A protein has these predicted regions:
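Core subunits and conserved enzymes of cellular information-processing
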Residues: 4, 97, 103, 185-190
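Conserved small-residue
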Residues: 1-92
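Transmembrane beta-strands of outer-membrane beta-barrel pores
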Residues: 5-11, 106-108, 115-121, 174, ...
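Extracytoplasmic gating/loop element in the C-terminal half of outer-membrane beta-barrel translocons
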Residues: 118-197
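Glycine-rich, aromatic-lined ligand/substrate-binding cores of catalytic
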Residues: 91-124
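Membrane-embedded beta-strand positions in outer-membrane beta-barrel channels/transporters
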Residues: 2, 99-101, 174-178
């Protein structure tokens, strides 16, 4: 058995790019999508870790079924300001990385497996945000009736914590089954060893 565990911590000490002199942060990650002009998802800020999601904070629907968000003072609004009403909503960096490999043997057979995983990180689901946009519903092969948003909720897909999801996973990356052919059979044909996968 081989087991590797890692946990990394980082912190931005200083931003030195001349384009950002006088500021303490850089807004990054501008995914494309309908109605998303000027939206950013992450921030590089002095004193904070790399990979922080910094965007609108979703607060559900109001009584009329319209998406609402928290403004910078934590008051509810249906018309949030891009780049102003932003909050920290998660970390893209995993808290734990895992690699585990093992080989099992039985007589002439062996089975090797390798698992990889990350835990405690967030991801942004831009596909879900784009396909949920009620303004363009019906222009894709997804029925506008498949969404739980009203057609009048034109801000339902604003890049926000609504689409920040758990990014943890554990995956089987490789698996191989092998068989070592009996050496007595191989000696007859002058082969030292033969292994089948």
């Amino acid at each position: 058995t081989n087991l590797n565990l890692a946990s990394n911590k980082n912190r931005i000490v200083k931003l030195t790019n001349p384009l950002f002199i006088g500021g303490d942060s850089i807004r990054r990650v501008q995914p494309d999508g309908g109605g998303q002009t000027g939206s950013t998802l992450q921030i590089f800020k002095e004193g904070r870790p790399l990979g922080q999601f910094f965007t609108l904070k979703y607060a559900g629907k109001d009584a009329n079924g319209v998406s609402q968000y928290y403004d910078k003072n934590n008051n509810l609004t249906t018309t949030p300001l891009n780049g102003v009403d932003y909050h920290y909503v998660g970390d893209a960096q995993p808290k734990l990385l895992l690699g585990w490999g093992n080989t099992f043997t039985y007589k002439k057979f062996d089975l090797s497996v390798f698992f990889r995983g990350v835990f405690g990180n967030k991801i942004f689901n831009a596909t879900r945000a784009d396909l949920s946009y009620v303004v363009t519903a019906g222009q894709t092969n997804i029925s506008p009736y498949a969404t739980d948003d009203k057609r009048t909720d034109a801000r339902n897909n604003l890049f926000s914590s609504r689409y920040v999801e758990d990014g943890s996973y554990l995956r089987l990356k490789t698996v191989s089954l092998g068989y070592n052919v009996n050496s007595r059979l191989l000696n007859k044909v002058k082969i030292r060893s033969l292994r089948a996968y």
